[in-house]
Design a protein with these regions (language model features):
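A broadly conserved detector of short glycine/acidic/proline-rich loop/turn motifs that flank catalytic sites
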Residues: 14, 59, 94-96
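Short, charged beta-turn/beta-strand-edge "cap" motif at the junction between a beta-strand
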Residues: 56-62
Length: 101
């Protein structure tokens, strides 16, 4: 039986990591790291290759700006010296142009 795709939300402040930077990363994608919230980290651990996520610009803009695909399951986040948190690798599927009211 084929795996059921799960859908997620990944958020970043656009001055830290933006949709335009994600586009420039190309098909190799990027490591989504730096998550230091335990609930969010637990969700990262549940993500599987092929799952999709909305890319949300938080704080500035506050809008969904794209869709990314998980291309590598969770692994230890190299930016976490204590090795408690994880990261995933993602690549852009589509940039969204949603009208804001």
């Amino acid at each position: 039986m084929p795996k059921k795709i799960q859908y997620w939300l990944l958020k970043s402040e656009p001055n830290v990591w933006s949709i335009d930077q994600q586009i420039k990363a190309g098909s190799k994608g990027v490591v989504w790291d730096g998550v230091r919230n335990y609930q969010a980290a637990n969700n990262l651990k549940k993500m599987r290759v092929g799952d999709l996520s909305f890319f949300y610009h938080s704080n500035i803009g506050k809008e969904i700006v794209g869709v990314v695909k998980i291309i590598k399951n969770a692994f230890i986040d190299k930016t976490d010296k204590k090795k408690r948190f994880v990261a995933v690798q993602v690549r852009l599927v589509e940039k969204l142009h949603l009208q804001k009211d």
